[in-house]
Structures are given as C-alpha cells and as structure tokens.
Amino acid sequence: MKILLPVDGSEYSALAAEFIASRTSLLGRKPEIEVLNAQFLNGSVVTGALLSEVWGEKTLEELYRVRAEKAFAAVRTPLQVKGIPFREMTVRKAPAEAVLEETAAWKPDLIVMGTQGKTNAEKLFLGSVSTAVLAGTSVPVLLVRDAPAPKKDDLKVGIAVDGSPYGEIAVRYLERYRELLGANPEIRVLNVVEDAMNAMITASSDCDMAVVTEEEARKLEEKTFEENTRPVVESLRDKGFANVTPVKLVGSAGDRISSYANREGLDLVVMGSRGYTNFRAAILGSVTTRVAAETAAPVLIIR
C-alpha cells in the first residue's frame, strides 16, 4: 500500500502519523510512505519573490529548510518508534496544488491528512487544503482530527451507506486494504432513513391524500433500511469480515452519523462520496462534509 502523508508541522500532522503508526496489521505489509511538505510563504508567489529580493536567495533557502525540518520533525517520532520506513519530500508550491500534483505523479492508494476540527462545516472546509484535495482527486482521503490514535489494532468501524453504489465501492476498497482495520474489526453498517411518519404527515398537508398509520410508516422505514444495508452486510461477510452489524438511524444523515460515531466511540468512519462538478455544492451540500466536520474519529472518504 502506498500512503501519501502531507505535513505542515501542526499537531494534526502528528496525529495523522500516529494513526498510521497504530495500524499494526498494515505495518506488517510494509507500506510505502511518502511524507510531503509544501513551502509557500503566506500563500503568495509574490511574497516569496519579494522576500528573495530583500533577504537574498540564500536566506530564503534557509527559511524554507528550517520550516520543512519543523514539519518533518512533527511526524518522525511516531513513525520511527515503530520502525516504519518513509521518505521525505519538500516542494515549493501551494499545499493543495502540491498534494494533487504528487498524487497524480506517485499514484498513492491513500492520502492521510491531519485537519483542524471545527463544528461549522463551512468554516472547516472553505479555503482549506483538505477541501481542495477532496475536490481534486479520486484517491481515497483519510481525514484525521484531534482524536488520539487507536490503542488496539482491531478497529470499531462505521460504514455509512445510502443504497447508492458507493457503499459497495467502499467495501471493495476495505477488502483490498483490510489491514487498515486490523485482523478482526467490528463493523457497523450505518444507514440513515427519513422519519417516514413525519414525511407522510407533511406530504398529506400539501395535498388531499390519506395519512398512513404509524405502523405503516415504520414498515416503510424498515423496508428502506433493509434494502440499503443488506447487500453491504452480505458482501462484507462474504469477504471474511465476521463481526458486521447493520444499524438504523433516523433523521438528518450528517447529524445522525456524526453523533452516533461520537457516542459509540467509533475508531473510524468510512463514507463514499459522489463528488461534484460544482465546488460550492460539494462543500455545503455534502453529508460527507458534515460528518467530517463533526466527527471526532478519523473519516475515510472513498470516491
């Protein structure tokens, strides 16, 4: 497995490295890890050019070197303690551009990024490196926030499904790289269904139609839940994942998934993402974005 680890010297980069180092089963497969640091002063080419003119190229080179060393130092310890080989690479580009270009060139199987957590999804993602990377690549991205790395190899994982093909895409990825989850992970297949009774009451108030009974509404919820989860549960079990449980949640998908993950202490949340051609729609309209913003555990986004 090839893993790209972009770093910026923050505590979140260190947490991302610690998550990788916690994957004992993965380390046994000897993954290739590249640690990438992008140097881009104040996000401006002009700033770098002006400083080069004022300070001189030699001084600017030293600044780049010191900043890169600081970024690498933050992740070396957790990787080296586990004896994990990795290589370091520094480029002079905007961070998102650097990650996307290296992804296209090196073709990693996974990008692991530390990201600062906020409760407001728009504040978290608009203008952030994480957003640009998610919008610009189809390679799976693992976003690590401020939760400590799992202490055990076997993870408690939530896979969010909605009846779309992305649930099966996520299953295929996890089957191929199952060492990410440990030898015997506990998997919860999460499906959020609409509150059928409330939906029917709302619909009946807009037109002349009979209101269904609560029992009929609940049967509709169960039917939807069964249709959305059964194929994924069966596929996981067929692929050798023994501990798989379907979980029904009712309400708003983003809120219910994140609150369940936090309440149950999940070690990892896995989600498929359709991707969008409209960038703002991807940021503000995505359940995936909401979950990534509000869930303490790392979130693996597979497209």
Where are the model-predicted features located?
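Small/aliphatic-rich secondary-structure junction motif
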Residues: M1-W55, I84, L155-V211, S235-K239
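Hydrophobic alpha-helical membrane-association signature
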Residues: A16, A71, A170, F225-N228, ...
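Gly/Ser-rich helix-loop-strand patches that form or flank binding pockets
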Residues: A17, L26, A96-P150, S259-R303
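General small-molecule cofactor/ligand-binding pocket signal
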Residues: E34-L36, R87-V91, L142, R188-L190, ...
